[in-house]
Amino acid sequence: MAEVFVGPVAQGYASGEVTVLLASPRSFCAGVERAIETVKRVLDVAEGPVYVRKQIVHNTVVVAELRDRGAVFVEDLDEIPDPPPPGAVVVFSAHGVSPAVRAGADERGLQVVDATCPLVAKVHAEAARFAARGDTVVFIGHAGHEETEGTLGVAPRSTLLVQTPADVAALNLPEGTQLSYLTQTTLALDETADVIDALRARFPTLGQPPSEDICYATTNRQRALQSMVGECDVVLVIGSCNSSNSRRLVELAQRSGTPAYLIDGPDDIEPEWLSSVSTIGVTAGASAPPRLVGQVIDALRGYASITVVERSIATETVRFGLPKQVRAQ
C-alpha cells in the first residue's frame, strides 16, 4: 500500500500530487551489516584501541558513527604504532586486503579481525585457484578501489586489470595464453557484460568463475532501479561518493536518460533538481543506512504532497556469520 505524506507544496513542483517510487531492495546488504556489526562488537570487547584499515564500508555516516564510538580509521598499517598498544586490534574492511597486507599485520604482531565480505573472499579464492593452475587472470574492476587492490594482490604476477572493451582490445599476450576472468562485486551489470563479451570474442577458451562474481545485492539494487527508472523525472541515490555500487546506480539512471544525483542524506538535496517533477525515484546503495531513506522521504514531503510507492523486485534473506573472534559465545 502506498503511503501518503502531506506537506507544503514547493514552488516549481508540478501541480497535484508527486509520486515517490521507492526501489526495493535498497540500503544495507549482508556483507555491510556483517562488517559494521564486527566493528561494534570489537569495540565492545577490545582491551586496547581498535584500528580499522580503510573505511569499513564506503559511507561517511557509518564511518562517522563508528569513529564516535571509538574506532580509529587508518589508511595503512604503518599508521598504527609499532609495537602496537597493549590489547590493540585491527579490523580489515569489507572490501578485503591482499596477502601482502595480511603478512604485514602478522610481521608486526597485530591482532586481526577480518571483516572482508564473504563474496569478496570468494573472488580472492577464485583468483588464487586460477593462478595456481597457470591461467592469466583478467580482473574486471575499477582501478584504485580497495576491492580491486586486494584482488590484484592475490596473484600479482598473474593478474591483469581491465575496465572497458578498449582495455581488452589492448591486451598483448603471448600465443596460447589461457585466460580466466573475474569481476569486482559492485560493478554495473550491463557494462560488465560488454567487457565479458569482448573477452570471449577475443579469447574463445576464456575461463570463468563457477558462479557470478557481481554480488546479489548489487544485482538486486540495479534491477530494482531499472524496473522503475523509465517512469521517473529524477532519481535520488542515497550513498557516499566513494561507494562504487551507489555510483553505478546513478550511472544506470543517467544512461536511461533520467537525471540522477548521489546524496549522502537529505541535506544534499537541491530544490532545483525537483523543479516541475511529478515522479521522483529514490534508492540507496548497499552501504547506506536504511534510516537515511526515511530522512530523505521526510525532506521530500517538505516540498509537496507525496505518495510513496515501493517497487520491489526481490526479497533478500542472505545473512553472513560474524568472524569467529566476535561471535556470541
Swiss-Prot record:
<feature type="binding site">
    <location>
        <position position="29"/>
    </location>
    <ligand>
        <name>[4Fe-4S] cluster</name>
    </ligand>
</feature>
<feature type="binding site">
    <location>
        <position position="95"/>
    </location>
    <ligand>
        <name>isopentenyl diphosphate</name>
    </ligand>
</feature>
<dbReference type="GO" id="GO:0005829">
    <property type="term" value="C:cytosol"/>
</dbReference>
<feature type="binding site">
    <location>
        <position position="245"/>
    </location>
    <ligand>
        <name>dimethylallyl diphosphate</name>
    </ligand>
</feature>
<comment type="pathway">
    <text>Isoprenoid biosynthesis; isopentenyl diphosphate biosynthesis via DXP pathway; isopentenyl diphosphate from 1-deoxy-D-xylulose 5-phosphate: step 6/6.</text>
</comment>
<feature type="binding site">
    <location>
        <position position="245"/>
    </location>
    <ligand>
        <name>(2E)-4-hydroxy-3-methylbut-2-enyl diphosphate</name>
    </ligand>
</feature>
<dbReference type="GO" id="GO:0051745">
    <property type="term" value="F:4-hydroxy-3-methylbut-2-enyl diphosphate reductase activity"/>
</dbReference>
<feature type="binding site">
    <location>
        <position position="287"/>
    </location>
    <ligand>
        <name>isopentenyl diphosphate</name>
    </ligand>
</feature>
<comment type="similarity">
    <text>Belongs to the IspH family.</text>
</comment>
<comment type="pathway">
    <text>Isoprenoid biosynthesis; dimethylallyl diphosphate biosynthesis; dimethylallyl diphosphate from (2E)-4-hydroxy-3-methylbutenyl diphosphate: step 1/1.</text>
</comment>
<keyword id="KW-0560">Oxidoreductase</keyword>
<feature type="binding site">
    <location>
        <position position="244"/>
    </location>
    <ligand>
        <name>(2E)-4-hydroxy-3-methylbut-2-enyl diphosphate</name>
    </ligand>
</feature>
<protein>
    <recommendedName>
        <fullName>4-hydroxy-3-methylbut-2-enyl diphosphate reductase 1</fullName>
        <ecNumber>1.17.7.4</ecNumber>
    </recommendedName>
</protein>
<feature type="binding site">
    <location>
        <position position="58"/>
    </location>
    <ligand>
        <name>dimethylallyl diphosphate</name>
    </ligand>
</feature>
<comment type="function">
    <text>Catalyzes the conversion of 1-hydroxy-2-methyl-2-(E)-butenyl 4-diphosphate (HMBPP) into a mixture of isopentenyl diphosphate (IPP) and dimethylallyl diphosphate (DMAPP). Acts in the terminal step of the DOXP/MEP pathway for isoprenoid precursor biosynthesis. Has a reduced activity compared with LytB2. Is unable to functionally complement the loss of lytB2 in M.tuberculosis.</text>
</comment>
<dbReference type="GO" id="GO:0051539">
    <property type="term" value="F:4 iron, 4 sulfur cluster binding"/>
</dbReference>
<feature type="binding site">
    <location>
        <position position="145"/>
    </location>
    <ligand>
        <name>isopentenyl diphosphate</name>
    </ligand>
</feature>
<dbReference type="GO" id="GO:0016114">
    <property type="term" value="P:terpenoid biosynthetic process"/>
</dbReference>
<keyword id="KW-0411">Iron-sulfur</keyword>
<feature type="active site" description="Proton donor">
    <location>
        <position position="147"/>
    </location>
</feature>
<feature type="binding site">
    <location>
        <position position="215"/>
    </location>
    <ligand>
        <name>[4Fe-4S] cluster</name>
    </ligand>
</feature>
<feature type="binding site">
    <location>
        <position position="58"/>
    </location>
    <ligand>
        <name>isopentenyl diphosphate</name>
    </ligand>
</feature>
<dbReference type="InterPro" id="IPR003451">
    <property type="entry name" value="LytB/IspH"/>
</dbReference>
<keyword id="KW-0408">Iron</keyword>
<feature type="binding site">
    <location>
        <position position="287"/>
    </location>
    <ligand>
        <name>dimethylallyl diphosphate</name>
    </ligand>
</feature>
<dbReference type="GO" id="GO:0019288">
    <property type="term" value="P:isopentenyl diphosphate biosynthetic process, methylerythritol 4-phosphate pathway"/>
</dbReference>
<feature type="binding site">
    <location>
        <position position="185"/>
    </location>
    <ligand>
        <name>(2E)-4-hydroxy-3-methylbut-2-enyl diphosphate</name>
    </ligand>
</feature>
<keyword id="KW-0004">4Fe-4S</keyword>
<feature type="binding site">
    <location>
        <position position="244"/>
    </location>
    <ligand>
        <name>isopentenyl diphosphate</name>
    </ligand>
</feature>
<feature type="binding site">
    <location>
        <position position="145"/>
    </location>
    <ligand>
        <name>(2E)-4-hydroxy-3-methylbut-2-enyl diphosphate</name>
    </ligand>
</feature>
<feature type="binding site">
    <location>
        <position position="287"/>
    </location>
    <ligand>
        <name>(2E)-4-hydroxy-3-methylbut-2-enyl diphosphate</name>
    </ligand>
</feature>
<dbReference type="GO" id="GO:0050992">
    <property type="term" value="P:dimethylallyl diphosphate biosynthetic process"/>
</dbReference>
<dbReference type="Pfam" id="PF02401">
    <property type="entry name" value="LYTB"/>
</dbReference>
<feature type="binding site">
    <location>
        <position position="145"/>
    </location>
    <ligand>
        <name>dimethylallyl diphosphate</name>
    </ligand>
</feature>
<keyword id="KW-0414">Isoprene biosynthesis</keyword>
<feature type="binding site">
    <location>
        <position position="243"/>
    </location>
    <ligand>
        <name>(2E)-4-hydroxy-3-methylbut-2-enyl diphosphate</name>
    </ligand>
</feature>
<feature type="binding site">
    <location>
        <position position="243"/>
    </location>
    <ligand>
        <name>dimethylallyl diphosphate</name>
    </ligand>
</feature>
<feature type="binding site">
    <location>
        <position position="245"/>
    </location>
    <ligand>
        <name>isopentenyl diphosphate</name>
    </ligand>
</feature>
<feature type="binding site">
    <location>
        <position position="117"/>
    </location>
    <ligand>
        <name>[4Fe-4S] cluster</name>
    </ligand>
</feature>
<dbReference type="GO" id="GO:0046872">
    <property type="term" value="F:metal ion binding"/>
</dbReference>
<feature type="binding site">
    <location>
        <position position="95"/>
    </location>
    <ligand>
        <name>(2E)-4-hydroxy-3-methylbut-2-enyl diphosphate</name>
    </ligand>
</feature>
<feature type="binding site">
    <location>
        <position position="244"/>
    </location>
    <ligand>
        <name>dimethylallyl diphosphate</name>
    </ligand>
</feature>
